[in-house]
Each structure stands twice: as C-alpha cells, then as structure tokens.
Swiss-Prot record:
GO terms for molecular function: ATP binding; hydrolase activity. PANTHER family: ACTIN (PTHR11937). Keywords: ATP-binding, Cytoplasm, Cytoskeleton, Hydrolase, Nucleotide-binding. Actins are highly conserved proteins that are involved in various types of cell motility and are ubiquitously expressed in all eukaryotic cells. Essential component of cell cytoskeleton; plays an important role in cytoplasmic streaming, cell shape determination, cell division, organelle movement and extension growth. InterPro entries: Actin, Actin/actin-like_CS, Actin_CS, ATPase_NBD. The keyword Chloroplast does not apply. There are at least 5 different actin genes in tomato. The lineage of its organism: Eukaryota, Viridiplantae, Streptophyta, Embryophyta, Tracheophyta. This is Actin-105. The keyword Nucleotide-binding applies. It catalyses: ATP + H2O = ADP + phosphate + H(+). GO terms for cellular component: actin cytoskeleton; cytoplasm. Its main location: cytoplasm.
Amino acid sequence: AGFAGDDAPRAVFPSIVGRPRYTGVMVGMGQKDAYVGDEAQSKRGILTLKYPIRHGIVDNWDDMEKIWHHTFYNELRVAPEDDSILLTEAPLNPKANREKMTQIMFETFNVPAMYIAIQAVLSLYASGRTTGIVLDSGDGVTHTVPIYEGYALPHAILRLDLAGRDLTDYLMMILTERGYSFTTAAEREIVRDVKEKLAYVALDYEQELETTKNGKDAEKSYELPDGQIVTIGAERFRCPEVLFQPSLIGMEAVGIHETTYSSIMKCDVDIRRDLYGNVVLSGGSTMFPGITDRMSKEFTALAPSSMKIKVVAPPESKYSVWIGGSILASLSTFQQ
C-alpha cells in the first residue's frame, strides 16, 4: 500500500490475520482480539494465523476488512474518506467479489471514489509496455495474462493454482527428508525465508542434480532463530523446479512455461509475435535467480524457431503491480 506517484510502496506486510489462541493468559498486556501483518508475524507463537486471500481471491471478508483497516489507519495513517482508492484484483476474479469489495469500500470506509484494476495489467505498465504477456506468480496463484494495447484478453487468460505457498510447502517436505522437522505455521514462515534467501532455478535440472550429487560446494547454511544451523544443497533448486514441473508435487498441471505458451496460442495469430517479444515476469515467485534464463530456454524450445523471444523480469518485480498502480493513478486522465 502507498500513495500514487511514489516510486515504492510505503507499507509492505503479509496479508495475515492472527487471533490469540488463548484469551487472557497475559494479564495487563492490553491484548487485542486480532493482529495484522508483521505484528501477527512476530507474535505468531501465541496466535492462530489465517490467510483471508486464497489462490488470489478473497474468501474471508471479515479478516480482509481488518487488513484494510490496518492499512489505512496504522500503516498509511490516512482517512479513507478523504482520498480516492485504487484496488487491484486477480484476473478472472468473480464479479460477486468485485461487488463485495466495492461495497466494503463505500459503506465501511466511506471512500469518495474507487477503481479496481487487474494486477497483471499494472505489472505490464510498470515495465513500460502496453502490449505483452505477463506471468504473474505470487503466494497463492499464478496467472498468464496476454495484454494488447492495455487491454487484457480474457479468453486467453490461464490460471494455475501453484505459487509461493506450494513451493514453501514442498521445501518443508524435502527438508524433512534431510531430517529437519518443520510443521507449524510459525515454522512455515522460517522455511519461506529459507526459500527467499537461498533458492534458485537451475538452467538444466537433471545436469544440476548430477553436479550437486557429490559436491559439498553446492551447500549453503542457514541459521534458525534458535541458533541451530540448517544445511541445504540440491533442495535450493529442487524447490522452484516445481514451477516448471508441477508433477513433482503430484499436480497434473503443466509448468509455467507451457501455461504461458498455451496462453499465447489462444490469442489471435497476428499479435503473437508481439507477445513472444514481451514476456514479463511479475510477483514474488518470479524473483528466483536464474528464472529468466530458464524461462527463455524453455520458451524457445516451444515457440516457432524464427520467433524472437524476450523474457524480462523487472528488478522490483515483487512490487511491480503496486508500481503500475502508482503510475496509473497519477495520470491526469485517470483522476477524472
């Protein structure tokens, strides 16, 4: 969250709501009935954590309202009734959800005006383009969205229920094979951090497995909050490999490269060249080192041989949706 025209968001926090597991244990702590974002994160030991957004779509409105309240009053410190609001939504978001979102904004927060933009379109704006295909992969869902002259082409949008949370779960599982045990919600957050700091995408998965089989040099260590050291080797690239081979976690879907390709093939033949030349990666799950090269490699194998392919991942890809929103909201034509 932040203000239009800024080049980076003012507030970034996970969309989590935590409620105390035990009430009134700590007398005089002034315990709240719910904690949001980083505060929930830091007190996760005594809380039950809930994610109101599942697979990119809101399914718990009470918690979502708490998150918005926290955003306005605690993070940005603004009165929502004074400013227009730009919200974003997942592609193919059900109409009922959009209506509910609008209702809460107008009735609970009394905003004077609002607009709901599609996340992928904003990512494309942030990369300075109006035509291209966006592969947007966050925590709960991955989408491929072809966009032509600023308009998303709904018939060609594809959705893959495979994203950051699944990668974290998979890493938890393969770390168990190593003899480490991570099970609780609090421990999942630790594994997520391991993933964000150490994981990378192999250019050639099979070859990388061979290389790391015998070598200790591929291993990296990570210190847990209690001082214990975890060593991880091949797990570093086995984790994000799931994006290219969902079968590793027993999913029947095809990988992100094939999904993107299918998305392009659903588009009019005349615009495909423009899409192949402007593949934009966005969202937290596209931040792995090596993902751009691997994507280019896999994509070149699928596409016609004469096609010029360009895959770009803006450095701030985790925030590119927000940055695109900041650009859009600060245009004078938009404000009217």
